[in-house]
A protein has these predicted regions:
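Substrate-binding groove/exosite segments of carbohydrate-active enzymes
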Residues: 1-90, 101-105, 195-210
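Catalytic cores of carbohydrate-active enzymes
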Residues: 92-118, 122-210
Length: 210
């Protein structure tokens, strides 16, 4: 999500990265790996998708389309973008509140339990980007427009604390299993940590941190 020079200097090369992400690294359910194999070949889907990375891929596809103006390219990629976003909605926003509530892996190598400003804002922009692409291709995007409005409202009314966007830590009211049982990245719960969980919530959450 951070590299912005390559798509402007070598746009055709950058678009091949989207081809790999969506055509090789994404399975039929819409799950996308965040590390593809070299040489390029099919990969296993046996760990979490990265919320910021997968949603960011939709933003990058939108950016690459705007830079290139290649309508044929984006039209062919569009069904895979929809498949990716629908996976994200189903996995992290199943109640369709407009925020990523279920535990979502991210670039910090942790799972955020409950909505955070970083990933939920990328979610909002992915909804916006896919809506714009869909409209340009003549598709009905009302579903994504509705979710986008909910997302912006959630960010402004529930995550913004007057100074910055904080995280709303959630774990008891989610579909995900107990944090001590959920698959995570090199994280286990000692007996002491289990006691802290009842008071403070899952490990490594940002909460009111900035």
């Amino acid at each position: 999500n951070y590299a912005q020079a390559l798509p402007h200097l070598f746009p055709a090369m950058e678009r091949t990265l989207r081809e790999t992400e969506f055509r090789v690294g994404q399975n039929s359910e819409g799950h996308q790996v965040f590390r593809n194999n070299l040489p390029i070949r099919p990969t296993r889907h046996d760990f979490h998708a990265a919320a910021d990375g997968q949603l960011g891929g939709i933003l990058k596809a939108y950016r690459d389309w705007r830079i290139s103006g290649d309508q044929k390219w984006i039209a062919e990629l569009y069904p895979l973008l929809v498949q990716s976003l629908e996976y994200c909605i189903r996995t992290w926003d199943p109640r369709e509140t407009g925020a990523l509530e279920e535990p979502h892996h991210n670039t910090y190598d942790i799972e955020f339990w409950g909505p955070d400003g970083m990933c939920s804002s990328i979610y909002a922009e992915a909804l916006n980007a896919l809506s714009k692409i869909g409209k340009a291709l003549g598709h009905d995007t009302s579903r994504y427009d509705t979710l986008l409005a909910k997302s912006v409202h959630y960010l402004e009314e529930r995550l913004f604390n007057g100074e910055y966007f904080a995280q709303q830590v959630m774990w008891r009211e989610l579909n995900a299993p107990d944090p001590t049982q959920a698959m995570t990245f090199h994280s286990t719960y000692s007996e002491e940590a289990r006691e802290i969980l009842d008071v403070e919530g899952p490990k490594y959450q940002y909460g009111n941190g900035c």
